[in-house]
Amino acid sequence: MGKTAFIFPGQGAQKAGMGKDFYEKYDTAKDVFDSAGEWLDLDMKALCFEENDRLDLTEYTQAALVTTCLAMEKVVEEMGLHPDVTAGLSLGEYCAIEAAGGMELKDAVTTVRKRGILMEQAVPAGKGSMAAVMGMETEKIEEVLADIADVSIANYNCPGQIVITGLAEAVAEASEKLKAAGGRRVIPLNVSGPFHSAMLATAGKELGKVLEGVTLHELKIPYVTNVTAEYVEDPAETKALLEKQISSSVRWQQSVENMIRQGVDIFIEIGPGRTLAGFMRKIDRNVKVYNIQTVEDAEKVCQELV
């Protein structure tokens, strides 16, 4: 038998209505949303289930998305489906750690709320930016970026999709040079800051202080960290990795490839959107990928796999 990984999306996957059907049908999910609302003093139902202007603001997005994904994940486990390893893209790593038993739900939700605020405040609006580079070899991108200051790779998503980040002018310059060097498309991203760039190192240090107050537990199963794409089995490493993660590249493709090498052949994306499933198809078409964003999805997948 192969192994199963639960994978969780990052910021950008959020959408109004996410998790509502889980809330209405399963007490487990209802408890997660209601508890998160109490801990954060936020109306989580209004934030996640109704059209509103706050869901796309980083300080709200992060808590809303982590709450939703973990509410779904707990229902899936209740149905009898369990992972052998977890991983999450950027923000999703907090879901991965909680699902692996390394962090309490309350700590995951309250920490990402603070993380969102720190990231929002780290760089003045408009000073930093990000762009997705499509259809270009990673080595070629790294070569072009090597000659430009204040820009770096934010995400190694999958073959043919790399995200760059940094000072707005540097990202603009890099975008032009990448197009000239053969990049098929370079798409500016609608984000509020230069995530996963050195410009967020100060926010990382502040997050480190927040994490000092968080109790980490022995992991029931390993999770894979974005920073190195390696398996983490010792909870003592988690805080330093999360502090570093804010200003480091997200090695998503490498993380997935590592899980496949370790015998994972079923990947279950839990949360709104199908972003990770899309990346998976470009990384390795031989593994099975399931996507759970509705109750119907969860019931269907669990019926097949449990």
Residue ranges and their predicted role:
Residues 2-140, 185, 266-296:
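FabD-like malonyl-/acyl-CoA
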Residues 77, 179, 260-261:
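Non-catalytic positions within long, well-ordered alpha-helices that form the structural scaffold/packing
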Residues 11-13, 40, 100-247:
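Alpha/beta catalytic cores of group-transfer enzymes, especially the acyltransferase/condensing modules
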Residues 1-2, 213, 217-231, 237, ...:
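Cys-dependent protein tyrosine phosphatase-like superfamily
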Residues 48, 145, 175, 280, ...:
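Short, flexible helix/strand-to-coil boundary loops that buttress conserved ligand/catalytic motifs
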